[in-house]
Amino acid sequence: MTGTGRTVTRVDLCEAVYQKVGLSRTESSAFVELVLKEITDCLEKGETVKLSSFGSFLVRQKGQRIGRNPKTGTEVPISPRRVMVFKPSAILKQRINANGTASSMSSSANAAAGDKSESASGT
């Protein structure tokens, strides 16, 4: 399940569980489905799902607001709704930046941020 630009599907997750855990393919599929269903059920109830060293899935309530139709420019009411948000953990962010193509950009951005914080603190 490594590589860049690839989409990992349920089938891929089931296969990884099958290969790494040693469950049968049927059991692996049932396991993955059970985990995804539990996450979905919690989010439907408005609960936050926090997975240590991975991140948090949370539901936010967005209020009604006025938007614009980009073609006509007319105002359009946007109904209140709930949206799901994923907030990655600091550990996951570090792993992505260490292993991804954005690592060089992140390092230079972090270095620049470090320079600013050092000059602000007087060190």
From Swiss-Prot:
Single GO MF descriptor: structural constituent of chromatin
Region described as Disordered: 97-123
One GO CC annotation: cytosol
GO biological process: DNA recombination; positive regulation of metabolic process; regulation of DNA-templated transcription; regulation of translation
Listed Low complexity bias regions: 102-113
Leader sequence residues: none
Official protein name in the record: Integration host factor subunit alpha
Species: Rhodopseudomonas palustris (strain HaA2)
Taxonomic lineage from the root: Bacteria, Pseudomonadati, Pseudomonadota, Alphaproteobacteria, Hyphomicrobiales
